[in-house]
Amino acid sequence: MEHRTHRRRGAVHTAEYQYLLERLREARRQAGLTQVQVAKALGRRQSFVTKCELGERRLDPVDLQRFARLYHKPISFFLPGTRKR
């Protein structure tokens, strides 16, 4: 896979990480949840969810697992080359 980077508000993300962010937003929409609902379920602020989805806050593996569990998606859903619905 070609290694490209994207800039968003001072952050630099690889194409792979940008893909993860897109899938994170998609999974939330598929689950029919708002950012406020997700934040409440995770015990976080809505700004946490927004920053994660925009790439302003780097996701760690534990956070990704929590999102995946809430959205009823396998971790592979969020990773390039493993597209599953």
Question: Regions from the language model: what does each represent?
Answer:
Residues 42-59:
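Recognition helix of helix-turn-helix/homeodomain-like DNA-binding domains
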Residues 22-41:
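Short basic helix-loop element that most often maps to the first helix and adjoining turn
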Residues 43, 62-77:
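DNA major-groove recognition helix of helix-turn-helix/homeodomain DNA-binding modules
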Residues 1-14, 76-85:
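Short, charged recognition helix plus adjacent turn
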Residues 24, 35, 46, 61-64:
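Helix-turn-helix DNA-binding elements, focusing on the entry/boundary residues of the two helices
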Residues 18, 29-30, 58:
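Short amphipathic helical patch at the helix-1/turn junction of helix-turn-helix
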Residues 31, 42, 52, 70-71:
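Core residues of bacterial helix-turn-helix
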